[in-house]
Structures are given as C-alpha cells and as structure tokens.
Amino acid sequence: FISNKYATKDHLIYEICNEPNNCLEKNNPEKPWECTKDTSVTWEMIAEYANRVIPVIHYEYEAVGAQHPVVIVGTPQWDQLVDACLKEGMCQGNGKDLCDSLPERDARLKFDNIMYAFHFYPGEHHEGFEKDGKKDYYNMYSYIYDVLGRLPVFCSEFGLTNPDGDGPIFIDRTDKWLLLLSGNNAGKQLVSFCNWSFSDNERASSALNPGACAAKNWNDVTVSGDYIKRVLSVVNKGVNDTTVLKESNLYTK
C-alpha cells in the first residue's frame, strides 16, 4: 500500500523487519529489557523475508519509472549483529572478539540501495568492561568500527539511556558513538541516525517534558532532548561540516 501510494515521492526511506528477535521471556529485574529466553532469528530468516518484500516495493517504483528507494533491512539480535550477512553462524554477546572467530561468507542482499540497520543504547552498548570477574559486555565500538568498513549502515534508532528507554543519561558514551558514526570508522562512513524518541512521556529518552506536546511548547526539552537539539545544530551547519567531535566536544556544554 505505502509503496503504491508514494512511489512518485523521492524522499521516502523504507525500513523493513525492525529489530528482528524472538524473545519469549523477560524476567531480569536489573535489566528489564534483557531477553532471558529466546530462539534466535538468523540472517537467513531475515533475508527470506527481505527477498519477498523488497521486490514488491521495487515493482511499484518501476511502474512509474522511479528510482528504487533506499531500503533499510533489520539485522539479528535487535539490529546489533549488523554483519550477520558476512558471517557463518551467530555470535551471541555483540562482541567483536566473538564475531571475528566465525568463518566469512557473502550473503548480502542482491538489490541496489540497500542499507543494514544498527541500533544502540549506551547503557548497554559501549566498549565493554569486567564485572564480578567476568566479561559482562563486549566491545561494541570496536565491532561497529570494523563493520562500517564493510557494509552500508543506517543507525535507525539510538537513545542516550538503557535499552528500555529509561534510566541514566549517558552523555559521554553517546558522544563516543556519534563520533564513530561521523566518519571516524574503518570505512569513513558518515552514518545517518534517528534518535529515540520525539515524545513527552516520563521516560528519560523522551525529548520533551510531560505536557510539552499538549502545550505545543517545543522548547520544553529534557536532558536528552537538549543534547539532541545541540547535536542537530552541529550536523545541520552544512554538508561540508563533518568534523563533529573530531577536534572538540561539540555536543556538550
């Protein structure tokens, strides 16, 4: 329906298969977002879906003589195993040290204008650290740094918080992520991003304070909203301004 109705519009981006997962149970009170029981969604499952949906989108655009639109395709484990199409098997834990041990392959989608989705929340996705004598998180920075040298990526969701959209605000960790997405990676990619979320609910990830929408007070921003507003003011200075954080911490006061 959407591709049929808007095939003549050249400003649409499609995202299919958002955050593929098969989470059956969440019962960790310390990490309410964490899936404690699941059956993994593999790249093969996602690719089968994409190979059915993308031709339908393309058909509508070709019918009106339009160029194929950009289609962002979800990746396994909530859009975090971004290079699953280049690896045999699944590496659990989102870690470069784990994924590097898997054999290489090329199972990329055979369409033009395809990008691969990546989501991050700095409360859980960062450089990794030891907890209680064992590795609790893996080095996602290092992993995505390398992936950006191999695949076109769109960060279609990120927040400044924990993955449930709440909890502390992690300014420094988010700075580091946006620096990486701003060309400071193996492929020198300038990665487009979308922030979660433009809303006025009580979660820490909301850009606006409760009641701001009803009052149409778009300056009533939260800590997260103030940060994103300043980020966009930097990014929107002009297409030649790709320095972002390379020389100074432009995103923080």
Segments (PLM) and residue ranges:
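Extracellular glycoside hydrolase catalytic/binding regions
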Residues: 3-13, 17-191, 200, 206-233
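Aromatic- and carboxylate-lined catalytic core of secreted/periplasmic carbohydrate-active enzymes
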Residues: 222-253
